[in-house]
Amino acid sequence: MHDVLIIGSGVIGMSIARHLSATHLDVAVIDRDVPGKHASYKAGGMLGAQNEFTEDSDLFQLAIESRAMFPQLSKSLLDETGIDIQFKNSGLIKIANEHDDISSIKRQYQFLNSQDRSVKQLSDDDLLQLTHGEVKPSYAAIHIPHDGQINAHHYTLALLESMKLRDIKRYASTEVTSIAVSYTHL
């Protein structure tokens, strides 16, 4: 019997299991097939904590807090597993490639800049300079300097290795089709 069962061994499930294992709970992860081979395996590695927000919310605040943890998480995983997730605080450029995207990106800029004054609108010259000429001018662009990226494949491998080192039980090739809830008193 386990204290906690986590369904899904993508990066979210493995991260939760890794964190909970430090509390001395008996944690196990169930996966329908091979761990880390779906969305986690295909991810590009962009953290994008601010990328989709146009207003303040609990989720926005959680995303910002999560992003702030990546430098230490990267070091912790490297120390524990020897796998470098290649965290880079490289910033993020968001571009409006179509005229219809201009109002959306400007609304997002207004919100993000109100939360972080380092978020800037980019002129065509700014965009060319920031990307060393690799990105052509667009309808509108913003720069989010405090965002970052990781190597998603290395992140998945590091979390998987961490689970092994922590003896977190994994049930692979096990599909959960329903959950039965029962209450017992200790």
Language model: regions and residue ranges:
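A conserved beta-strand/loop element that lines the FAD pocket in flavoprotein oxidoreductases
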Residues: 166-176
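Conserved dinucleotide-binding and phosphotransfer motif residues
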Residues: 23, 115, 166
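N-terminal Rossmann-like FAD-binding beta1-loop-alpha1 element of flavoenzymes
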Residues: 4-28
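Dinucleotide-binding Rossmann-like beta1-alpha1 core, especially the glycine-rich loop
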Residues: 46-126
